Amino acid sequence: MSYDRAITVFSPDGHLFQVEYAQEAVKKGSTAVGVRGKDIVVLGVEKKSVAKLQDERTVRKICALDDNVCMAFAGLTADARIVINRARVECQSHRLTVEDPVTVEYITRYIASLKQRYTQSKRRRPFGISALIVGFDFDGTPRLYQTDPSGTYHAWKANAIGRGAKSVRVEFEKNYTDEAIETDDLTIKLVIKALLEVVQSGGKNIELAVMRRDQPLKILTSPEEIEKYVAEIEKEKEENEKKKQKKTS
């Protein structure tokens, strides 16, 4: 039997190959990173260069699900569009029914459940996306979750998905500390530093989404805004290098 063609059949060694292939599609996608700060959550994505005549506003890897929740994804954009639309409808339905916005975990669990159903149904295939979902609960607590094509989800302090995820996670493990997220600017810099590990051409290929407590989502697409942070990061690197040289001399 061809186990890699059947969506709902396990191989003898316990694999669901279609789910694993969906995870491979995620690994080929643009890098996306997320960091949970003290009073801020930040998403950053690697921007791919667009065709000369293409409107780059139509190429977005970050989107709002509700006033208090935002999502970035890696993988197949068409699949992401279905998940995003379903999640937005669920957010609206929750507001109408409960008269409160969704919690970040609630909508993450909804998205994860949707993905999981597509791993157990005939005539469907798994969604080829992973998502980073950030936001604030109504008590002001910042949240960051990650979901994958199998339907699992976990809470994180900082994480990455997409083709550069492994390198970025190593960077986060080295640099993520309470001091590194002490202020909003430091949290934003941490995201940009991590993306610079895998993104060429500096700030012009980076897009950021910033959400602060009790403030609306702000998406930074202007290269000038991001280059300002990149210049500060480069300056800090140079100063650290000079300090190291003084110590060794």
UniProtKB/Swiss-Prot annotation:
Keywords: Cytoplasm, Nucleus, Proteasome. Belongs to the peptidase T1A family. It is found in: Cytoplasm; Nucleus. The 26S proteasome consists of a 20S proteasome core and two 19S regulatory subunits. The 20S proteasome core is a barrel-shaped complex made of 28 subunits that are arranged in four stacked rings. The two outer rings are each formed by seven alpha subunits, and the two inner rings are formed by seven beta subunits. The proteolytic activity is exerted by three beta-subunits PSMB5, PSMB6 and PSMB7. PSMA7 interacts directly with the PSMG1-PSMG2 heterodimer which promotes 20S proteasome assembly. Interacts with HIF1A. Interacts with RAB7A. Interacts with PRKN. Interacts with ABL1 and ABL2. It comes from the Eukaryota. GO terms for biological process: proteasome-mediated ubiquitin-dependent protein catabolic process. The lineage of its organism: Eukaryota, Metazoa, Chordata, Craniata, Vertebrata. This is Proteasome subunit alpha type-7. One of its GO terms (cellular component) is proteasome core complex. Component of the 20S core proteasome complex involved in the proteolytic degradation of most intracellular proteins. This complex plays numerous essential roles within the cell by associating with different regulatory particles. Associated with two 19S regulatory particles, forms the 26S proteasome and thus participates in the ATP-dependent degradation of ubiquitinated proteins.
